[in-house]
């Protein structure tokens, strides 16, 4: 028996401002830090010893995990992976979602956010929001850095990393991943075998741990959000 815990970072500054964030390295706000503390407390109540910790490269995920580890009093090394980063929103990066609905129409913005293979226009490489211009990503080969992504693109990079680095350890280790709405949606699509319509409806809450239990043959047995009150309207498979 083993466990996988997926945690979307706590609320960020740009989450509150309702902006497309993507690969921009925005930190948690005060509510996000509170959510991360609560996540740590909920995980601690389960008395699960975490063997491996993973995070994206992004500050909001790293700091969420740091707060969780403080609550667990467990400071094992964290493996940071850019492959777990949020989806890159291309030219939408930094823009307010409600303003874009007024400009492009609600249906178009919904398609950009939830369709499987639609990419926004690429982000100009001269933009300060482009990953090539953000110090966080200087260690990543330039040809690996996207300037826009669909959910399908995000799924492919996340699941490739999961298959190569994480899945091999599920059988005998408990693992916690701190990541993002779309990278966790990608993992849920894979682990719950969701189709493209189902994944478009899946909401991932900030700072609410999703606990998955596996048997010794790597079969997913069940899953639950640890903050059940905040998860009462969410789909859990």
Language-model regions: role of each:
Residues 181-186:
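GST superfamily/GST-like fold recognition
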Residues 227-237:
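Acidic, His/Gly-rich catalytic cores of divalent-metal-dependent hydrolytic chemistry
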Residues 157-169:
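Phosphate/ATP-binding catalytic cores across multiple sugar-kinase/actin-like superfamilies
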Residues 9, 83, 180:
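Active-site glycine-centered loops adjacent to acidic/histidine catalytic or metal-binding residues
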Residues 39-130, 137-139, 189-213, 220, ...:
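Phosphate-coordination/substrate-recognition cap region in phosphate-metabolizing enzymes
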Residues 174-176:
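Metal-dependent active-site segment of extracytoplasmic phospho-/sulfohydrolases and closely related
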Residues 1-5:
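Extreme N-terminal starter segment of soluble prokaryotic enzymes
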Residues 11-69, 79, 142-160, 201:
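Loop-to-helix element that buttresses phosphate recognition and phosphoryl-transfer chemistry
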């Amino acid at each position: 028996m083993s466990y996988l815990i997926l945690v979307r970072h706590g609320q960020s500054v740009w989450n509150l401002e309702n902006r497309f964030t993507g690969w921009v390295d925005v930190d948690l706000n005060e509510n996000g830090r509170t959510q991360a503390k609560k996540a740590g407390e909920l995980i601690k109540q389960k008395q699960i010893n975490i063997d491996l910790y993973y995070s994206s490269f992004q500050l909001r995920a790293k700091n969420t995990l740091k707060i969780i580890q403080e609550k667990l009093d467990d400071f094992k090394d964290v493996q940071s992976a850019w492959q777990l980063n949020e989806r890159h929103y291309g030219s939408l990066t930094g823009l307010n979602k409600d303003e874009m609905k007024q400009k492009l129409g609600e249906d178009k913005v919904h398609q950009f956010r939830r369709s499987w293979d639609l990419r926004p226009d690429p982000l100009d490489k001269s933009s300060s929001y482009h990953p090539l211009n953000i110090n966080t990503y200087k260690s990543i080969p330039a040809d690996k850095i996207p300037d826009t992504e669909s959910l399908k693109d995000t799924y492919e990079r996340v699941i490739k990393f999961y298959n190569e680095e994480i899945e091999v350890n599920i059988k005998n280790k408990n693992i916690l991943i701190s990541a993002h709405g779309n990278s966790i949606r990608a993992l849920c699509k894979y682990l719950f075998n969701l189709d493209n319509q189902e994944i478009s409806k899946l909401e991932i809450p900030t700072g609410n741990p999703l606990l998955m239990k596996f048997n010794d043959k790597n079969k997913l047995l069940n899953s639950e959000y640890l903050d059940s009150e905040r998860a009462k309207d969410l789909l859990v498979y």
